[in-house]
Amino acid sequence: YGRLSAVITKARRTAGKGSYQLEAADLAREDHLHECLLLYVPEPSLPRSVLARQAEWVQERFSGRAWLAAELFCEGEDWGWLGRLQDLAGSTGFPLVAAGNVHMHARSRRALQDVLTATRLKCAVAEAGFALFANGERHLRSLQALKSLYPPALLEQTLQIAARCHFSLDELRYEYPDEVVPPRYTPRSYLRNVTYQGMDARW
């Protein structure tokens, strides 16, 4: 979790507010993300040769802990895109997994999602155009709905990923850097002391 947080922090610092940016070298560093699993979400508009190069790059660096994500949203091109992904998986040895790119808990929140997108773009919803999702399928779908969209093997891969994830939020503890807390203080007593000093200076 700490390594992942460090990578996210770096991604935020190298981009403008509200954006993230990572270079390939950031992902390739040996000391980062070695305990993390990765979903490679290919861009449908890219040519197959580019997708293959990207997939091979990810496979080389995350072998045994990376999957090719198949996101299907009932937008008319699902079967063609799934076929392309299956070809790519077959030629690169990349395991293919069902993925949802979930943005809302229920389809009924689509209007709110559109408002949030327009707010991010600083425009009216009517002006957001193709920046809005084409439909409300990026929500938490039932297992029955997923079974009607994805081949069983892709859903099986989601269980394999889940079985490898042992992290729990209960494991998180804030760790104060040793150099911040003077020897005679505990982290809590030092924070209290500094807070009172700030109160005295301000008020």
Label the predicted regions.
Residues G90:
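Surface-exposed, charge/polar-rich loops and edge strands
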Residues L72-C74, V102-H103:
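Short beta-alpha junction loops
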